[in-house]
Amino acid sequence: MASTHQSSTEPSSTGKSEETKKDASQGSGQDSKNVTVTKGTGSSATSAAIVKTGGSQGKDSSTTAGSSSTQGQKFSTTPTDPKTFSSDQKEKSKSPAKEVPSGGDSKSQGDTKSQSDAKSSGQSQGQSKDSGKSSSDSSKSHSVIGAVKDVVAGAKDVAGKAVEDAPSIMHTAVDAVKNAATTVKDVASSAASTVAEKVVDAYHSVVGDKTDDKKEGEHSGDKKDDSKAGSGSGQGGDNKKSEGETSGQAESSSGNEGAAPAKGRGRGRPPAAAKGVAKGAAKGAAASKGAKSGAESSKGGEQSSGDIEMADASSKGGSDQRDSAATVGEGGASGSEGGAKKGRGRGAGKKADAGDTSAEPPRRSSRLTSSGTGAGSAPAAAKGGAKRAASSSSTPSNAKKQATGGAGKAAATKATAAKSAASKAPQNGAGAKKKGGKAGGRKRK
């Protein structure tokens, strides 16, 4: 019976085992370091499915489990340390995969109980990678069916008899079979899918998070989302496993293998532009520093004029000019931004450095010169306004008239208005009424 079953299911088994590897690799593990790891988990998932369904039916999935004998060991490492798991997996999965064909007949596996136990232990999982090939061998598939039956029996009572009979590997492998083997829903046959669903969440919560973190460290954080998306889809690891190993991004991208490497390539360019922008911004900052020193020289107007109001006006003018000077610096920065794209940033930055208003856009420079004395630079305009105000008689009204340096004029006007309002406040404000006895009396009535 087993042989007939096998022959009938064999093509599907080969095809399916292939899919299984791929899907499994993605579903459970691909987030973990390498595609190889992924394969390992995937295959383990396959074998788990086998454990539940394959033994009784002798389907291709069972074939898969039987054929792969290595991964069990990898799994033994997996629960503790995903990193070592991935590295071990590459070597182990590869070597055992070769071993199975080298063994020639998997009959030896089926016949020898120790090997069948090893399969139950999850070693078989490792080979599930190559299960597609091995299953094509009818003799192997027969032996595999026998092995799978043992596996199923062991898996039903995982903690019990299988552990006793199997070698030391069995202990860890059994846990792996419980936790990891059934992780992939899509890989498992419909009968095992319910079990797989339960295990998938638990497995991802434990292993998936670790692998995500690992990816984040290696590939700068994008991976976290990608790997989650990839875990569900069956295509990420399919045909481009080698690519996945090299780029690391194709692995976890949600099935769009071509797009992910493109992302990586595109990412290389913006940093160069950002460097240019940063340089330009530094130049702009230097320009605004120069402007600030100019604005501080305009503060000299404060001390020279004895009038407090005037000093206030001139200092306000200085702060205003500093703002406009900062815009000069901004112009320099934006110029250098353009330079990052067109190569012209450096000249603009230098001009702004020198405090030359010609570096500004024409609109800004015209505004500055018209508000000041006509001198080209902002600090000079501030100085001119302050000097003229200081030389005039220091009454507030004269200061207001004479402080013609744009911002200074407005500041003086504001200052006089505030003074007059303050002087009137005692007569008009609520405080006056409270003080006056009659007013207070009336209010009480």
Swiss-Prot record:
Q: Name one GO molecular function term.
A: DNA binding
Q: Name one GO cellular component term.
A: nucleus
**Biased composition, Gly residues: where in the chain?**
329-338
Which residues lie within the region annotated Disordered? 1-145, 203-445
> Which stretches are tagged as biased composition: Polar residues?
1-15, 25-47, 74-87, 245-256
Annotated segments matching region Required for nucleosome binding and for the protection of chromatin from hydroxyl radical-mediated DNA damage: 360-445
Residues spanning the membrane:
none
The answer to whether the entry has keyword DNA-binding is: yes
| Annotated region (Required and sufficient for DNA-binding and co-localization with nuclear DNA), positions in chain | 208-445
Compartments annotated for it: namely: Nucleus
> What does the record list as GO biological process?
DNA damage response
Q: Is DNA-binding included in the keywords of this UniProt record?
A: yes
The organism's place on the tree of life at top rank: Eukaryota
Compositional bias annotation for Basic residues: 432-445
Query: Compositional bias (Basic and acidic residues) at which positions?
Result: 88-97, 207-228
**Bias (Low complexity):** 61-73, 117-138, 257-306, 367-431
Question: What UniProt keywords are attached to this protein's entry?
Answer: DNA damage, DNA-binding, Nucleus
Q: What does this protein do?
A: Unique chromatin-associating protein that contributes to the organism's exceptional tolerance to harsh environmental stresses. Binds with a higher affinity to nucleosomes than to free DNA. Protects chromatin from damage caused by hydroxyl radical-mediated cleavage induced by X-rays or treatment with hydrogen peroxide. Suppresses X-ray-induced DNA damage that includes single-strand breaks (SSBs) as well as more hazardous double-strand breaks (DSBs), and improves radiotolerance. Also shields DNA against reactive oxygen species (ROS).
**Protein known as:** Damage suppressor protein
Name the gene. Answer: Dsup
